[in-house]
Amino acid sequence: MKKILIVVDMQNDFIDGSLGTPEAEAIVDNVVAKINTYTKDCVYATRDTHQDNYLQTQEGENLPIVHCIEGTYGWQLNEKVQAALGSAVVMNKPSFGSWELADMMVMEFAGLPAEECEI
């Protein structure tokens, strides 16, 4: 059975940007340590991705805080996390939800904001 790690939305806006918190900043080193326990072919990451019209979207109406606009500093993965990920697959996601990994049987998640986005 292949075990994978999915690193969820470890982006600057969720760590120290428009939706950041001290708690989010505090977990960065732990997420990096977790990434480093996996081989890179077993690590995937998600990146919350919005466009300039975010506030006019359904999500933007419910959470009217501009964040993770594609191409901005806030959209980028945290520098330490990006370095640990190396060439791992990073998937942009435009909204709440999930993606299918049909061949994967065991998934472990690390990242932000798990209470709102993925699970």
Predicted segments with their positions:
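Glycine-rich phosphate- or other oxyanion-binding loops that anchor nucleotides, phosphorylated ligands
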Residues: N92-A110, E115-E118
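Active-site acidic carboxylates
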Residues: M1-N92, A110-P113
